[in-house]
């Protein structure tokens, strides 16, 4: 799949190095830029409701995504936290004026009144970004999983990995160098999805996570971008831990993905 990149992503990466300094993880090199808000910030709906396991990192995820929008000036954030929020906001009426949906560590089958309508909304040219357990959401909805690009299968112990950066020009992966070292819960998926996505991060060996295939050669996707009709989709399997969400490089990874799905 050919990525459609816009030059504006480089500005956001520079802004982030200025605004989201952090002592919990490695930093990207380069100078700093004062924030230059866009003339009309986009609007994203960040969904954190869960119908299954609930990650302790969700409040940090909400805080981080909100801050990325505020400090870059690229987007404003609307939080969708409860079942009643989902039923009200994830509708054609609720999505009026929204440019992208984010599933930040959602789990289970959310009480969306008409999931098909939401998927058509994305297909019509809007954006979708999923973090970590967005792939552990809607196991009973093949159309959602097709839109996302894969389905969570299992994970082992949390472990340090060095993710291979496969695309040096995509805004979600270009700030990460050639490898991204991170300690997190590493997901494994039901299938290989290289044929239908632009792969951004991967592993060429199963992590030493205590599972039977630990340490063996493999091809494990970690982050990708894809189209869905005229819409754009970004997914990263990283983001289980609170300290990952505080990692300055992970923030650039997320911001680049959001800017790409917003077509900025």
Spans of model-derived segments:
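Bacterial N-terminal signal peptides that target proteins for export
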Residues: 1-9
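Helical hinge/lid and interdomain linker segments adjacent to catalytic or ligand-binding clefts
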Residues: 30, 34-35, 43-47, 52-137
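A glycine-rich, often tryptophan-bearing local segment used as a flexible ligand/cofactor-contacting loop or short
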Residues: 103, 107-178
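C-terminal motif of bacterial Sec signal peptides marking the signal peptidase cleavage site
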Residues: 17-19
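Bacterial lipoprotein signal-peptidase II cleavage site
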Residues: 21-28
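Extracellular ligand-binding/catalytic regions of CAZymes and related secreted enzymes
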Residues: 28-41, 56-59, 63-72, 81-82, ...
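Short, solvent-exposed loop/turn segments at secondary-structure junctions
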Residues: 51-52, 108, 135-137, 204-207, ...
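Catalytic beta-strand/loop cores that center a nucleophilic Ser/Cys/Thr
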Residues: 97, 150, 155-229
């Amino acid at each position: 799949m050919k990525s459609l990149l816009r030059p504006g992503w480089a500005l956001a990466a520079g802004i982030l190095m200025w605004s989201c300094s952090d002592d919990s993880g490695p930093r990207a090199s380069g100078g700093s830029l004062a924030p230059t808000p866009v003339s009309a910030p986009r609007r994203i709906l960040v969904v954190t409701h869960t119908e299954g396991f609930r990650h302790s990192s969700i409040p940090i995820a909400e805080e981080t995504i909100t801050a990325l929008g505020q400090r870059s000036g690229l987007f404003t954030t609307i939080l969708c936290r409860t079942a009643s929020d989902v039923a009200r906001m994830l509708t054609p009426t609720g999505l009026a004026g929204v440019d992208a949906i984010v599933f930040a560590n959602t789990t289970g089958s959310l009480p969306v009144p008409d999931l098909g309508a939401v998927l058509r909304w994305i297909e019509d040219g809007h954006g979708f970004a999923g973090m970590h357990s967005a792939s552990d959401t809607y196991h009973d909805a093949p159309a959602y999983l097709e839109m996302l690009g894969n389905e969570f299968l299992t994970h082992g112990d949390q472990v340090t990995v060095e993710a291979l950066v496969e695309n040096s020009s995509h805004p979600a992966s270009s700030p990460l160098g050639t490898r991204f070292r991170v300690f997190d819960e590493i997901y494994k998926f039901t299938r290989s999805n290289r044929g239908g996505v632009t792969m951004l991060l991967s592993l060429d060996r199963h992590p030493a996570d205590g599972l039977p295939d630990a340490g063996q050669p493999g091809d494990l996707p970690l982050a990708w971008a894809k189209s869905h009709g005229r819409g754009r989709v970004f997914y990263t399997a990283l983001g289980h831990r609170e300290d990952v969400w505080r990692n300055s490089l992970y923030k650039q990874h997320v911001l680049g993905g959001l800017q790409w799905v917003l077509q900025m």
